[in-house]
């Protein structure tokens, strides 16, 4: 059986890796990356809340244990 000649492998692999690296760099160069969003100042709206001026009960009487 003849031996496999591997002397030209580094000669072929090195330019292939260099070419792949250059292609990926060129593709990334043409890619548009968006800037992170900047926060916008928000205006707080005052809604009419009828429960604010009133006192409300926190617990219902039915949820309390029976008292003797």
Curated annotation (Swiss-Prot):
One of its GO terms (molecular function) is proton transmembrane transporter activity. Keywords: Acetylation, ATP synthesis, Cardiomyopathy, CF(0), Disease variant, Hydrogen ion transport, Ion transport, Membrane, Mitochondrion, Primary mitochondrial disease, Transmembrane, Transmembrane helix, Transport. It comes from the Eukaryota. It is found in: Mitochondrion membrane. InterPro entries: ATP8_mammal, ATP8_metazoa. The modification N6-succinyllysine is found at residue 54. One of its GO terms (cellular component) is proton-transporting ATP synthase complex. It is a single-pass membrane protein. The modification N6-acetyllysine is found at residues 54, 57. The chain crosses the membrane at residues 8-21. Its main location: mitochondrion. GO terms for biological process: proton motive force-driven ATP synthesis; proton motive force-driven mitochondrial ATP synthesis. Component of the ATP synthase complex composed at least of ATP5F1A/subunit alpha, ATP5F1B/subunit beta, ATP5MC1/subunit c (homooctomer), MT-ATP6/subunit a, MT-ATP8/subunit 8, ATP5ME/subunit e, ATP5MF/subunit f, ATP5MG/subunit g, ATP5MK/subunit k, ATP5MJ/subunit j, ATP5F1C/subunit gamma, ATP5F1D/subunit delta, ATP5F1E/subunit epsilon, ATP5PF/subunit F6, ATP5PB/subunit b, ATP5PD/subunit d, ATP5PO/subunit OSCP. Belongs to the ATPase protein 8 family. It is linked to Mitochondrial complex V deficiency, mitochondrial 2: A mitochondrial disorder with heterogeneous clinical manifestations including neuropathy, ataxia, hypertrophic cardiomyopathy. Hypertrophic cardiomyopathy can present with negligible to extreme hypertrophy, minimal to extensive fibrosis and myocyte disarray, absent to severe left ventricular outflow tract obstruction, and distinct septal contours/morphologies with extremely varying clinical course. Subunit 8, of the mitochondrial membrane ATP synthase complex (F(1)F(0) ATP synthase or Complex V) that produces ATP from ADP in the presence of a proton gradient across the membrane which is generated by electron transport complexes of the respiratory chain. ATP synthase complex consist of a soluble F(1) head domain - the catalytic core - and a membrane F(1) domain - the membrane proton channel. These two domains are linked by a central stalk rotating inside the F(1) region and a stationary peripheral stalk. This is ATP synthase F(0) complex subunit 8. It comes from Homo sapiens.
């Amino acid at each position: 059986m003849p031996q496999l000649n591997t002397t030209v492998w580094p000669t072929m692999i090195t330019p292939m890796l260099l070419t792949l690296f250059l292609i990926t760099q060129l593709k990334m160069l043409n890619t548009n990356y968006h800037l992170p969003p900047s926060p916008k100042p928000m205006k707080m709206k005052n809604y009419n809340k009828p429960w604010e001026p009133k006192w409300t009960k926190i617990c219902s009487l039915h949820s309390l244990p029976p008292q003797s």
